[in-house]
Amino acid sequence: MTIRPAERHDIPAIVRLLKLSLGEELIPKSEDYWRWKHIDNPFGVSPVLLAFENETLIGVRAFMRWKWQMGQNVYETVRAVDTATHPDHQGKGIFKKLTLMLLEQCKKEGVNFVFNTPNQSSKPGYLKMGWQVAGKLPVSIKFEKPASIILHAAGLKTNSQTRIDVSNSLTYFLDHPNLDGLIAKDRANQTFISTQPSVEFLRWRYKQVKVVEYFAAGFETNNLLRALVLYRIKPGKVGKELRVTDIFMESATYRREATTLITDSVKLHNAEYMTVSTNHQWIFSGILSLNALKIGPVVTIRDVMNGPMEKLQNFREWSPSLGDLELF
C-alpha cells in the first residue's frame, strides 16, 4: 500500500470511491461539491491523503480547514470530514492510518485542534485515537404550529411543495457594501470562540454552495446594514423547519430587529418551527420564548497543538452556529 497527498486530478477517483463506499446519503456526492468544499474554501485547500493498492484507490481521508477567533486570538483548525475505504479493503486499519498521518501533518503546520460531528458508528474509532466528546451542540426551538406538527408526525399532513422565491435577498445582502463593516462590529462584540468570518467566507458558505438553498433577511437604516440573518428551510417528518444558520448584529441594540427578521421569515415560509443554536439565545432574551432541547449533533474534539481545549468542552467558551456545523 502506498500513501500520498491528493492532487486535483484525483478528484474523479475520490468521488467514485466515496460513492462506492458510502452511497449518496443525504448530500449528493459530486466533483463540483468536492471542489467547493475542499478547494474553494476561503480558509484554505483541505489536506487530503490517499491510499493505493497498486493503481487502485482504496482509501481517502480529508480534513477541512477552519478558523475560529476569540478577541485577538485566531485558532487554525481542521474539521475531520470525508473518509472512505474500498469495500474490498476494509478491516485493514486504513482509516486509522490515514487519520493519524494527517494529524501529524497538521501538527507540523501549526494546527491548534481538530473537531467533527461523527455518527454513532465512527465515533468509537475517533475516541480510540484521542478524540474527546465536547458535548451536544445546544439547540433552541420555537414551535410555531403545534397542531400542524402533530398532524405531520401522525402522517396526516405532508409538506407543501410551493416554493417561496426570495432568493434575490441573499445576493443583495451578501453584496451589500456595508457587509464587511457589519461583520467586523459583530465580531468585536463577541466574547466566545466563534468562526472568523469575512464577506468572501459568507459568499462561499451560503451563495456558492449548490446542494442547499439559503436565504437572507436584513435590517437597514441610512443605507447601513445593522442586522443580518441567514437561514434555510428544511422539510422534515414534523413539517418545515426554519433553521437559523448565522446571525450578525452591529450591536446588541439590534436584538429586537434581528428577532423580527426571524419571526417574519417564519411567517413568510409558513414554517412549523424555528431552530437556532442556543449560543445565540441571549439575542432573544425577553423578546422571544424558546425551548432548549438536546437535538443538536454530538461534537468531538482533539488537541493538535496548544488548542484551547478547556474552553471548548461543553461549549463553555465556544459558540458554533448551526451554519458552522451543518452540511459538511
Predicted regions and their residues:
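Extreme N-terminal starter segment of soluble prokaryotic enzymes
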Residues: 1-3
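Conserved GNAT-family N-acetyltransferase fold
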Residues: 49, 59-61, 78, 83, ...
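Conserved acetyl-CoA binding element of GNAT-fold acetyltransferases
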Residues: 74-87, 239-250
